[in-house]
């Protein structure tokens, strides 16, 4: 009451609790970024550990996330999903430097979370339904894909010999300087899907890419994948070709955090 009387509104019990948390997390006020608002810090302080908070802090500044974008990335467990694809040193680098995009592998998340598409996970849908939903929610899809992506087209047509083929989504990655082709599968990824994407990549290298472009990247997205089958299917392929899962709902944070804790404990 005394603080409110002297300084105005905003000094309720909840805000005071978060102000204390802010001081404990950032004891040196000079380390705080003026690019972030109090609402950003309010969300950051909900993180369970310092590594996670540092990651979202760095990414919010680097990517100029609005508060709603920060909240979505936290709900989708972006930190845990990226961290589980690396080792302990990678987790620490992720927290200290944010997500660095330097190689094709850096743009892969497994799973990709597409809850914004609005397709009920139990309802049957066609691949074209998912493709259209992603195009209709392109801003959210680009947020999930990460920095550097520029949308090129949907159902990109390729004439190869006497046959015509179409790849679902095509992007250009401004950091990696290459095309990124995405093929969507409604169910489990099959070994034939790998050969099909490899065909598309070979076509792009020859017919589409410019001399100063890096080799294209292919991503086959499905709801499930057999790890051993994919290992054999990808063996011997020299193109940058990846397979990853997607899900139409937000992940369970507790499960991902438990997996990450196990990874860090095993590295001790």
PLM features per residue range, with description:
Residues 1-268:
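Basic, low-complexity intrinsically disordered segments
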């Amino acid at each position: 009451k005394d603080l409110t009387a002297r300084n105005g509104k905003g000094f309720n019990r909840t805000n005071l609790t978060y102000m204390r948390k802010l001081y404990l997390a950032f004891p040196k006020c000079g380390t705080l970024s003026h690019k972030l608002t109090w609402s950003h810090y309010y969300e950051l302080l909900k993180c369970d550990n310092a590594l996670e908070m540092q990651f979202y802090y760095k990414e919010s500044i680097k990517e100029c996330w609005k508060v709603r974008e920060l909240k979505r990335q936290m709900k989708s467990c972006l930190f845990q999903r990226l961290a589980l694809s690396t080792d302990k040193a990678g987790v620490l680098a992720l927290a200290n430097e944010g997500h660095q995009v330097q190689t094709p592998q850096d743009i892969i998340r497994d799973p990709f979370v597409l809850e914004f598409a609005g397709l009920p996970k139990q309802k049957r849908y066609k691949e074209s339904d998912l493709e259209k939903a992603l195009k209709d929610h392109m801003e959210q899809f680009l947020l999930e894909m990460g920095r550097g992506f520029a949308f090129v087209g949907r159902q990109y047509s390729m004439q190869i010999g006497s046959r015509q083929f179409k790849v679902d989504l095509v992007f250009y990655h401004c950091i990696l300087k290459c095309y990124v082709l995405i093929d969507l599968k409604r169910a489990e990824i099959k070994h034939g899907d790998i050969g099909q994407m490899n065909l598309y990549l070979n076509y792009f290298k020859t017919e589409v890419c410019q001399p100063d472009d890096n080799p294209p990247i292919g991503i086959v997205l499905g709801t499930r994948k057999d790890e051993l089958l994919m290992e054999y299917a990808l063996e011997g392929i020299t193109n940058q070709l990846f397979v990853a899962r997607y899900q139409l709902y937000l992940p369970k944070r507790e499960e991902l955090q438990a997996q990450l804790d196990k990874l860090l404990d095993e590295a001790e």
